[in-house]
């Protein structure tokens, strides 16, 4: 694939953020110079927040590995998977579904770390109060959404589409029972805004983003309410390509993993990163934790 085609998957605004640290070495490259380690993340929230967080992460990865590390923003969830597949990206912050999709395209890829909240993650169904839907406590309550408009987040979002759609099916509500075709807002922030403005009566959203939005007083709880919190599931995680060590030097994957697992909220530098991730710490994970996500994705035709 040409470099022009490869770059088309990356967001050009501002270019990639490149961080370099001295003291390390890796294999690959010409003249003994290791190539740049590319990282990215699914664009699940406001780009301003992502552009604050991931350059910080790139800097920490550079310091831990001694490599040149570049954060490469992408335009959408599909672009993350594609960039990972073709090798533009070697480490990516994935959702459960995008991680499963990426592993299916790059066998041998490994989920190396997740946030403490990702082992028991939840989606929320929220609604504009003008819709007249009362909160409920069981999946069967989703039948109350019949005749109402609904938006998901990104088409390949785990918490904003895959699992909400799974629970709609489990609750016995066919999408044809909704008013019109479900929307796809593109991100959790956009879903909340769509419900706030009553562009859609109901939205499926990531609980962590909702909680943060409420804490920042960016949503009026007199007009938007939570209808239901789904059961938990595994979601976000860092995914490493199988050629990470052969490209950048033996031990690179372990150095990155150790850095993530060692982030300490009691240290100011680490807390700044953890706060933007909405977590208290990172914990270990493994590919099998996403077996449920894989099964649901296959059932919904989202894993080609």
What are these regions (language model features)?
Residues 1-17, 23:
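N-terminal secretory signal peptides and thylakoid transit peptides that target proteins
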Residues 23-30:
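Bacterial lipoprotein signal-peptidase II cleavage site
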Residues 93-106, 167-170, 196, 201-222:
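A ligand-binding cleft/hinge motif common to bilobed small-molecule-binding domains
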Residues 72-82, 97, 178-193:
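Short helix-initiation/N-cap motifs at beta->coil->alpha
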Residues 34-41, 45-56, 233, 239-240, ...:
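An extracytoplasmic/periplasmic, membrane-proximal ligand-sensing/linker region
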Residues 109-118, 178-181, 214-232:
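Short beta-strand->loop
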Residues 115-171:
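A conserved helix-loop-strand patch within extracytoplasmic ligand-binding domains
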Residues 56-66, 158-184, 214-219:
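Ligand-binding cleft/hinge of the Venus flytrap
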